[in-house]
Regions:
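Short glycine-rich or small-residue beta-strand-to-loop segments that form or flank ligand, phosphate
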Residues: 63, 90-92, 170-173, 331, ...
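Structural signal for conserved beta-strand scaffold positions within catalytic alpha/beta enzyme cores
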Residues: 91, 137-139, 228, 358, ...
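Conserved C-terminal alpha-helix-loop-beta "cap" of PLP-dependent enzymes
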Residues: 298-474
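Charge-dense polyanion-binding interfaces
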Residues: 470-489
Length: 489
């Protein structure tokens, strides 16, 4: 693109173009998938449309192979790397969960230490269960008013690196679900000075690569790997993601790690959506996210004018634990109207037909992205104003803290695979948990394998259940019982 920052022709979408060419060839399918371009499953075709099922095809020479790309998929990955300023990019069809796990499995082996905040997505801890690495937690500060965890302070990271000089990597959220950013450039430098990799969970930061006035992206900050949820703010289909790597990471080894866990039947619907969405962002991303940021700022002003709500933004920035803030994130504190965030979340859907991203103990998040319009913002603002009028209470008995510092007893892998027993929830106090417990979204564990179960945590779990949070993780779907390490206090 002439006059742009890109080196390659970002008007090109090789997977999409190859699929269009293949469609015109009218090839007779004697391969999988068995619906045979939709003919074998007319109900599915009626639901999804012929154009969709017609390109739900298998890997073949004209369309390349995700496990070992040599033509159109490889081209698409090179274009993605160019668009995002990375040395290499990998198309991921197992969502950013797969991307995050690949980062950790690439950096760590059994017994290695990795420095990370505790408010990470469960995919990070899942990877520790798989590879046997040992977490060194940097417990984030908590904003006392909002009850949310913030970023990692520079001095906390520096201390962790000094105390654990053999750690192999530092992992950073860029940003958190709420839009909070740590000082990524400084953390990258500290990690590299100590001979460690810096990994970024950038599930909520796709737009950082294309928007002006937004926090620094992981690749621009010099991080070694970043997991980017293109489907969240980039416009691709759900479950599609990108894994980005810097120049000091061996791309061939990363591909081998990916192929340990990712499907051998990569969806061309997902891959083509990544290809088309990358092209769209390269061509129009800066304009799009400028508009998104403007909408979010307008919504913040309007919501704060209602009274009783606090739509927080850049005023949280303190130069350290909140080094920067993603202004596209529309996070709203609700406790001052006497309602938990999850209660407002449910009311918006059930009473006003508005589905927001999530509600937690004290906040809601409305996720704004490339598909939002001003009229939807007005509808959300009006609904919040009416909720305050109809449902406001005195708020007695509401919890306010979203984050509880963990008491780590043993590694996630050791605890997950250890002998265990199932106990009624209230009888687990003081025991060591051997499974995950979390509200989803956001998917940040309240408890992880290897952590001690405290009365405070049990109170939180029961409160979150009572308020209607979607609780996931344990074997018992009702979370009346938990698995704990047998014979271990």
């Amino acid at each position: 693109m002439k006059g742009s920052r890109f080196k390659l022709n970002q008007n090109h979408a090789p997977i999409h173009e190859a699929l269009e060419t293949f469609r015109r060839m009218r090839v007779v399918p004697f391969d999988v998938p068995g619906h045979k371009r939709g003919r074998g499953n007319p109900e599915l075709t009626e639901f999804l449309g012929q154009k969709c099922v017609g390109v739900d095809v298998n890997s073949m020479k004209p369309l390349d192979n995700l496990c070992h790309p040599v033509s159109v998929i490889r081209e698409a990955e090179e274009l993605a790397a160019d668009a995002f300023g990375a040395a290499h990019a990998f198309l991921m069809v197992g969502c950013t969960t797969s991307s995050v796990q690949t980062m950790v499995l690439t950096a760590c082996k059994r017994g290695d230490e990795i420095i990370l905040p505790r408010n990470v997505h469960r995919s990070v801890l899942n990877a520790l269960v798989l590879c046997g690495a040992i977490p060194v937690y940097v417990n984030p500060e908590v904003d006392q008013r909002l009850g949310i965890s913030l970023g990692m302070r520079r001095e906390q990271v520096e201390k962790a690196i000094k105390e654990h000089p053999k750690a192999v990597a530092v992992l950073v959220n860029n940003p958190t679900y709420y839009g909070i950013c740590s000082d990524l450039r400084a953390i990258v430098k500290m990690a590299h000075d100590a001979g460690m990799l810096c990994l970024a969970d950038e599930a909520h930061g796709t737009h950082f690569y294309f928007g002006g006035g937004l926090p620094v992206s992981a690749m621009a900050a010099g991080a070694d790997m970043a997991s980017v949820s293109m489907h969240k703010s980039g416009g691709s289909l759900t479950q599609s993601s990108l894994l980005l790597t810097g120049p000091n990471v061996h791309a061939g080894y990363v591909r081998q790690i990916i192929n340990l866990t990712q499907t051998t039947s990569g969806s061309y619907l997902l891959m083509s959506s990544l290809d088309i969405s990358r092209r769209n962002l390269a061509q129009r991303g800066r304009q799009i996210f400028h508009q998104v940021a403007d909408m979010a700022e307008y919504a913040r002003e309007e919501i704060n004018a209602i009274g009783g709500y606090y739509a927080f933004g850049k005023e949280l920035v303190n130069g350290n634990s909140v080094f920067d803030f993603d202004i596209t994130k529309l996070s709203v504190h609700t406790l001052d109207i006497g309602l938990a965030g999850i209660e407002v979340y449910d009311i918006l859907r059930d009473e006003y037909d508005i589905q927001i991203e999530f509600g937690d103990i004290g906040n809601i998040l409305a996720y704004l992205s490339i598909g939002d319009r001003a009229q939807e913002i007005e509808r959300l603002v009006s609904a919040l104003a009416e909720i305050r009028r109809r449902f406001q209470t005195d708020g007695s008995g509401l919890l306010s803290q979203e984050y509880i510092d963990p008491q780590v007893v043993t590694s996630p892998q050791e605890a997950f695979y250890a002998d265990k027993c199932s106990l009624p929830l209230r009888e687990t106090e003081g025991k060591v948990c051997s499974e995950f417990v979390m509200c989803y979204p956001p998917g940040i564990p309240i408890l992880a394998p290897g952590e001690r179960i405290t009365a405070e945590i049990l109170d939180y779990i029961e409160y979150a259940k009572a308020k209607g949070c979607n609780m996931t993780g344990p074997e018992d779907p009702d979370i009346l019982r938990l698995n704990v390490l047998a014979g271990r206090e």
